[in-house]
Amino acid sequence: MVLLPGGHLLVAKEKKPAAFIEFGPPHSRSRRLVRGGALADGERWPIKKGHHHRFVALAIWLPDKILAKTCADFSDLEIGPDGCLYLLSDKSSTIARLDDLPAGGGTAALLDAWRLGDLDGKPEGLAFTVQGRAIVGLDTRKPRRNLVLLEPPVAPPRGRGQSLS
């Protein structure tokens, strides 16, 4: 899940079909998600604690053919320190960097992808260090050794002038 400005949130629907769904307050409009457009670190999400809130689906993005082939399911979402949206697929054992999502829904497209290789568990959670290294949480039989810190960084912070090849 990714928090968006205005009390909106973006969730990944894992399968049948895999999709991204934006939820927000009733009568609000869908927002586009561009690089740097998620709720900033430390910024308050404008939803008050202790109150019941109603959210409605505002937009749906389905994967294009390349993204669907690269990521067989959508396990987790995260915003990298570069401001881009990233997706983790457990079935494909892949991290994908996604293109901007247009307002109102439509198609989600792949910008880049990284295969995770053999891991000692099922990749279910995604986070990033401030340097852009991916941390993958594994669903394992035992509750230890279930985090993997990947090298090299896949999401270098903005302003560093680095590019991925």
Regions found by a protein language model. Name each.
Residues 1-165:
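Sequence/structural signature of beta-propeller domains
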